[in-house]
């Protein structure tokens, strides 16, 4: 049986303070945006969610039941950079930031490297049972990037070349170890 995996990137609050590993709760406007896209997502037996507050709130705002937390879908561990802005990290550890953004094996912050994140997400994807059917998961943007790299067999250096805005959906189909990116035509009336 083919697995149909839809990854929905969590919504972002209106007043967004972008920080490494930031977990700002959703405001009413962001929750309304989630409800607006809910109908475009496929039906699934449950909605998996990463453990962050904004992923859980996004999953709950979809109105799908039950919402099941999946710890393996957690965001990248940013170590010492956790809670800091890009500007703060650049000012305090510019060389480390440059290394991290150019070398997927690097983890100058003492947390998880891009390569480690990619390996964790690949293991989760390939561990899905072949009879999983439809799977919908709300994830952070880094997790969606890692899943795309795995599905396409793309080099990990491509991680930073993928722009994944909040509430964007990625659909992958296949079986463990063999994945395809599925792109739906605009205006087809076809849901993801």
Language model feature labels by segment:
Residues 1-4, 76-88, 149-192:
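Acidic, low-complexity terminal tails and accessory targeting/binding regions
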Residues 2-65:
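Active-site-proximal alpha-helix that buttresses catalytic centers in soluble enzyme cores
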Residues 5, 45, 131-142:
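Generic beta-sheet signal
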Residues 14, 54-56, 75-76, 143-146:
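Short, active-site-adjacent cap segments at secondary-structure transitions
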Residues 25, 62-121:
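Phosphate-handling substructures
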Residues 35-39, 118, 122-129:
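Generic structural signal for well-ordered alpha-helical scaffold segments
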Residues 40-72, 98, 150, 173-192:
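Conserved histidine-centered catalytic loops in small-molecule metabolism enzymes
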Residues 49-50, 119, 138-139:
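Short beta-strand scaffold positions
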């Amino acid at each position: 049986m083919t697995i149909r995996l839809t990854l929905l990137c969590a919504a972002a609050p209106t007043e967004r303070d972008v920080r490494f590993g930031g977990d700002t709760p959703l405001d009413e406007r962001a929750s309304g945006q989630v409800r607006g896209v809910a109908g475009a997502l496929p039906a699934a037996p449950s909605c998996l969610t990463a453990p962050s507050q904004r992923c859980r709130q996004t999953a709950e705002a979809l109105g799908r039941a039950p919402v099941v937390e999946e710890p393996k879908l957690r965001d990248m561990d940013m170590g010492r950079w956790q809670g800091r802005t890009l500007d703060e990290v650049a000012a305090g550890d510019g060389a480390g930031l440059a290394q991290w953004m150019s070398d997927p094996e690097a983890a100058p912050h003492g947390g998880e490297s891009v390569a480690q994140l990619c390996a964790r997400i690949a293991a989760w994807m390939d561990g899905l049972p072949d009879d999983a059917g439809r799977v919908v998961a709300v994830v952070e943007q880094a997790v969606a990037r890692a899943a795309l790299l795995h599905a396409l067999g793309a080099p990990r250096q491509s991680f930073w070349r993928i722009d994944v805005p909040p509430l964007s959906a990625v659909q992958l189909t296949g079986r463990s170890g063999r994945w395809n990116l599925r792109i739906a035509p605009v205006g087809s009336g076809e849901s993801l």
